[in-house]
Amino acid sequence: MMNSNEIRQSFLDFFKERGHTILPSASLVPESPNLLFTNAGMNPFVPFFLGKQKCPYVPPRIADSQKCLRAGGKHNDLEEVGYDTYHHTFFEMLGNWSFNDYFKEEAIHWAWELLTQKWGFPKERIYATVYKPAPDEPGEFDEEAFRIWFKLFQKAKLNPLLHIHFGTKKDNFWMMGETGPCGPCSEIHIDLTPDGQSEGKLINKNSPLCIEIWNLVFIQLNANEDGSFSLLPSRHVDTGMGLERVCAIIQGTSSFRQFNRTISDYDTDLFIPLIEKLQDISKVSYTGSIPPTPDFALDPQLKKDIAFRVIVDHVRALAFAIADGILPSNLGRGHVLRRLLRRAIRFGQILGVNPPFLFEMVDPLVKIMGSHYPELIDKQGHIEEVISSEEELFARTLSHGLALFEEIKQKMIAEKRKEISGKEAFVLYDTYGFPLDLTQLLAKEQGFSVDTQGFERLMAEQRRRSLLSHEEDIVSLTKTSQFVGYEELEAEAEVVVLLSANRAIFDRTPFYAEMGGQVGDKGYVVFDQKKIEVLDTMKSASGAHVHRLAFTDDLKPGSRVYLQVDEKRRRCIAAHHTATHLLHWALRKVLGPETLQRGSYVGPDRLRFDFSHTGPLSAEELAEIERLVNEKIELNDPVTAEEESYEKVKNNPDILQLFGEKYGQRVRIVSVGRYSKELCGGTHVRSTGEIGYFKILGEYGVSAGIRRIEAACGKALEQFLHAQAAEQDKKWQILHSKDPSLPRLSKWVDTLDLDSLIEIFQRRNEELSSFEKEIKEREKLRAKKQEENFRREASQQAMAAIAQVEKIGAIPVLFLDCDAKPQSYLPLLWNEISKRIDSVAILASRSEGKINLFIGVGPSLTTKIEARNLLSQLVASFEGKGGGSKTIAQGGLKDSIEISSLFEKGRGILEQYGGQKGQTEPKATG
């Protein structure tokens, strides 16, 4: 059975063999100003369809897998996500295109060949739709497509009249807009009913048992402004097939061997690792339940399963959008991202998870999709940081906002009204950052509605109030600054504009703006005998250096000021930046030329360097890399920079470029000696001797095929060592509290030279490692002895418990209160019980400030009852959480609960199971 990467690649290979140029996915940020996001596979090729550009490939055929996002504007699937098996905000669209080259014959034949011969779709389960217009609809019956399909089904010994269905403009005519290129389309559907005998009766009926998998669009007409349609001089093919849907069909039917269950995109390898990670985080089990109808009353497990699907969907959308340079904000695309993130956090609360937690799900996503989308690997750290910081930002106001919502709810109940006023919704938005759709989601859960018109009126008023300052900011960000900071650290300048939040742009500046992994400069603005601290420097979209100041006071546009960069800080940053170039060179020397930079952080305190490599580096490799860097530092080689046109240098193999970076027309080439050349806009030392001693502090993996080295040099290294020495002392204190007999660490002497400090630091690390190992061994022996005692005790308790078995219907059941035993004791006890009797056991104990709960179900009883289902109902009654499998499940509850009440509730639930044979989900008890 193929996984998602194999399915995607086989599609691309299939069309490559048929003369198509394979293109990487375009960005989620579209070229068109009319689109929020790239939301369809054809978006990047609109200029070809419109005739504004000629397809540059010979033959003019393209295939790709395009990233798409639908979460705002006209194409918006947000509200459907989670409530069914196939709607997503982010998805991949597999597509092949012909620009005035092949047409219907090849497009249909190749689609049939890929599906039935390459992928093995059962021919008898495939149905095709063909355009047949109703009166007053454009164009004519697509007889050409009909005849092609007729012959294919006839050749497959299938009845074409059963397998070809006709559709009107609604389903089988594609238009780019009110005017412009358009044409009929032919959809391919697959019958997923158990017997495969639906005869196409479920086509376009929103049934999960008959799914559209591929749409073949034949662009042959032009919609004119007068409402008429005319033939285009050139004809094109545009096809689209959702990767998630294909994976669901192939994997959900075990390569077409099983059709006895509803397939789901979320049961594929694109989503399963994310769901498993979320189960680990939340300690809640995902069961895959789906509401049978949109208005179905949701029970607790359905709500949780919907939450799982919403969260894993939104994490995918967030990660890919951030990788393409979109950041959460209050405007445009950024606002959509912020809404997605806050919705995901709200659904996380249904699982009992509080932020930050979404960022933890980026790593499994990178492992799933990073091989095809390297931008995920390159930007993983950035994606995690953005999501985590945004989660923390919202977490600070979430609880207050929810408290206000609760007040609103109680007030509404008292006033017997069902609609949240526009003012109440606006306060939640304006004060606590709740997007309108989040308030609507909360309202929906309570059976309320929201006065959206009133909300929009208040929003419009707020926009009018802020319009002046907003326009000022937007206009000002068209300004540019002259950067003089390569040569100067102080400069006279004039204030060009003051922005909100104490930000300022000057006509010229020595302050480096954060870019390319290097942090922005700090320092001072001297004005009117006052020093104003510069807290950070960033770059605007127009290239202006935006300085964030502690205050602006009397500053105004036109003010003459004196700018001073923090020289010590800048020198540390410059040393670390040049050190990254030396490190890059040394890595390629030791590991091979295929080793390339995949990201970096250059700050005053240390450097971080991500690079492509499989597997950890050996101690010998790290030592050699460190030796090579320090060797070049000792040689005091010159560091020079020159500007050149990008066109002239872009194909020069001797000049390294950062993968995925977009360069301007003019670039800066930084050379170290005669051995290192890189495109780089950062600040550097004048010669390598200024770097000082270089030390690798750590090496570890950050994602599949990407390793990270952290290092420091010179004065920053010395400060790091002193700080770490204090941490070593703290660590020793913790270990000493566990074992007072531990000897003291080697003494730290602040006044020693750097080489001696490094030597003592390493010796102390070795001592701590030895102490830790010794204590771990003792704890391991202690734990082993405790487990042996527990096993003996569990065996004795299990023997005695057999006499306490009670029958509930046909089910033998044990309820055991294990007093103050830890959670680890309960599975040992179940193991002993299950050796002796096939039963259902509900075990509980009270320890570490909570109730531990364990449920075991004997293998012969799982057809009647599953442990995870029983647990989910039990913990839901007491606001606990947990998860598990068919045979075992465990969870935790508040310490205030009486175990006898817990058992009584369990008994009531089991009575429902015991009385109904073969039932896997009993009716809820009161």
UniProtKB/Swiss-Prot annotation:
One of its GO terms (cellular component) is cytosol. Zn(2+) binds at residues 577, 581, 680, 684. GO terms for biological process: alanyl-tRNA aminoacylation. PROSITE patterns: AA_TRNA_LIGASE_II_ALA. The keyword Nucleotidyltransferase does not apply. Its cofactor is Zn(2+). Keywords: Aminoacyl-tRNA synthetase, ATP-binding, Cytoplasm, Ligase, Metal-binding, Nucleotide-binding, Protein biosynthesis, RNA-binding, tRNA-binding, Zinc. CDD domains: AlaRS_core (cd00673). GO terms for molecular function: alanine-tRNA ligase activity; aminoacyl-tRNA deacylase activity; ATP binding; tRNA binding; zinc ion binding. Binds 1 zinc ion per subunit. Consists of three domains; the N-terminal catalytic domain, the editing domain and the C-terminal C-Ala domain. The editing domain removes incorrectly charged amino acids, while the C-Ala domain, along with tRNA(Ala), serves as a bridge to cooperatively bring together the editing and aminoacylation centers thus stimulating deacylation of misacylated tRNAs. HAMAP family: Ala_tRNA_synth_B. Catalyzes the attachment of alanine to tRNA(Ala) in a two-step reaction: alanine is first activated by ATP to form Ala-AMP and then transferred to the acceptor end of tRNA(Ala). Also edits incorrectly charged Ser-tRNA(Ala) and Gly-tRNA(Ala) via its editing domain. This is Alanine--tRNA ligase.
